[in-house]
Design a protein with these regions (language model features):
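Generic alpha-helical propensity signal that fires on short helical segments
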Residues: 21-23, 31, 59, 100-104
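Intrinsically disordered, low-complexity polar regions and short flexible loop motifs
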Residues: 83-85
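Extended, solvent-exposed segments with strong compositional bias
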Residues: 35-76, 88-95
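Short, well-ordered strand-loop elements centered on a beta-strand within folded domains, enriched
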Residues: 31-38, 97-98, 129
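Extracellular Ig-like/FN3 beta-sandwich strand-entry sites
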Residues: 77-81
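Canonical alpha-helical transmembrane segment with a positive-inside/aromatic-interface signature
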Residues: 1-34
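Short, surface-exposed linear segments at secondary-structure transitions and domain or protein termini
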Residues: 24-27, 41-53, 103-117
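Acidic, serine/threonine- and proline-rich intrinsically disordered appendage/tail regions
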Residues: 56, 87, 92-145
Length: 145
């Protein structure tokens, strides 16, 4: 599972950290009510020292992941929600900055990957195309789960 973020301002963000929490509803039996559950997701990288262009935050879905057995139908039934919290230090204003976002089960794009959003410009400097931040393409069949 992947999320992509970018800094649309010219000021530097350092010591950027990401935390991703999974939330789902577990139905009770006849005597207990449904309960919302939470689990922190392990990330390939939780922190970057400098946030120059973009960052693709990755949670590997393997046997240790709470999402390992989830498919689209399970996500809907359990009313899955993914909470993303980003925190970093804005060098220009010497402030801690926060950003959070929530994704519900119906916003998940299955069997897709992000398209590249940066390329070399005419002077050789890297150009970041922010309009492509959410743009995805279908995975080839051999890479689909």
């Amino acid at each position: 599972m992947q999320f992509r973020i970018a800094n649309e301002r010219n000021n530097k963000i350092i010591d950027l950290m990401a935390q991703v929490t999974l939330s789902w509803v577990e139905n009770g039996d006849d005597r207990t009510m449904a309960r919302r559950r939470f689990a922190n997701l392990t990330l390939e990288r939780q922190q970057v020292n400098l946030f120059p262009l973009n960052w693709t935050i990755v949670h590997p879905i393997d046997e240790q992941s709470p999402l390992f057995e989830f498919d689209e139908q399970t996500c809907e039934e359990k009313r899955l929600e993914i909470l993303v919290l980003i925190e970093g230090h804005d060098e220009m204003f010497s402030n801690t900055v926060h950003r959070s976002h929530s994704y519900t089960w119906d916003e998940i794009e299955w069997n897709r990957r992000f398209v590249p959003m940066y390329f070399p410009g005419p002077t050789g400097a890297t150009v970041l195309e922010l309009k492509k931040i959410s743009e995805t393409t279908e995975l080839p069949p051999e890479d689909q789960s």
